């Protein structure tokens, strides 16, 4: 049976490869993906459809699913692996922060935020 480190690796591979099967294999039944661009959090049963919406949305903004993850911080405490990272999608202005939590059953939470310097400047 895979451990939390292997499940976390499988999860990110699923995103890099846009492979819904790998995503579904790596998450818990009570998985939640919280994206502020969505009307409500996404559960495991909706994850494949969300991935297709994400790909279409980001491609319309110029991205091609090539990622840069930087400023990664990892904590493994009490059986929960927590990853924080800055993400950017090449070819677009999309960037933000991600928080991913994984236990030995799988990834159970991902929460992302978006950063937009222009929008932030215009709202001040």
PLM segments and residue spans:
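Short, hydrophobic secondary-structure boundary micro-motifs
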Residues: 24, 34-35, 64-67
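Soluble or luminal CAZymes and related metallo-dependent hydrolases
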Residues: 3, 7, 46, 92
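A general secondary-structure boundary signal
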Residues: 23-27, 33, 84, 98-100
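A short gly/proline-enriched turn/hairpin at secondary-structure junctions
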Residues: 32-42, 57-59
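Short acidic-aromatic low-complexity motifs
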Residues: 1-30
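A beta-strand edge to alpha-helix "cap/lid" segment located at domain peripheries
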Residues: 48-124
């Amino acid at each position: 049976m895979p451990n939390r480190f292997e499940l976390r690796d499988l999860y990110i591979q699923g995103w890099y490869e846009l492979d819904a099967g790998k995503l579904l294999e790596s998450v818990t039944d009570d998985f939640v993906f919280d994206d502020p661009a969505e009307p409500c959090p996404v559960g495991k049963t909706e994850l494949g459809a969300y991935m297709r919406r994400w790909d279409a949305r980001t491609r319309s903004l110029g991205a091609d699913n090539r990622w840069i993850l930087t400023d990664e911080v990892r904590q493994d405490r009490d059986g929960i692996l927590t990853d924080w990272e800055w993400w950017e999608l090449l070819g677009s202005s999309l960037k933000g922060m991600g928080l991913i939590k994984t236990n030995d059953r799988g990834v159970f939470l991902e929460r992302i935020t978006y950063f937009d310097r222009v929008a932030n400047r215009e709202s001040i």
